[in-house]
């Protein structure tokens, strides 16, 4: 009996160590860089308090003089453009892409979760509606709090400290990634799928969050592109991310050669053979986990 208790305690220790020392922070050097830079893999479902468990995260941030992220949130004109881009053209009617039963099903789901139906939201693109609906699911089932998400923590700190923040994507690219990276009929199917099978979306995000807590970035990439992943974030999205990573390497290279860049990006973009870390390594940069 004593032996089993000791084994149980040991397993708990290993589990705790794995979570609190997840490999999500990396040092980037070499390839003519005059000083190291750092890249932090983030997960929007994680509370900002998780950063306290990442060894040397604040020390590495303090050693940098700029923050680089996917899209700079301080660009208010860009945010206005994004809101406009979320609207359907006047010539497109969402009702025409669904049966009456499907349209009513979506309308009812939106009313229950967003307190608004398609009478008010029917001019929005289906990709935007699907994301709004998913966010409400995550708030309800995974305690997602956008204001406390670790995803934008360092960006906000930098802005408060007058440290420059650079976005890897411009406004047009960001609008494409959010609203138009998939054909319109796919977006319509995706919205219906999210409404009909919300539990799949929640299970997916829960699994991704758990992998992130253990620093399993490669597993996260494989999980997204797996053939049996039928959620709103799947293989077609992974292909878009992989292609974009190649462009990001070009845009990051000047910053990395200058050094002292603190990069924060969604962990899904980083792992796997097509992930940003592998592509930076292929470009000649040295990548090393900070907490090893």
Please annotate each region the language model reported:
Residues 1-27:
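Bacterial Sec-dependent N-terminal signal peptides
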Residues 18-19, 47-50, 240-245:
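Short, solvent-exposed secondary-structure boundary motifs
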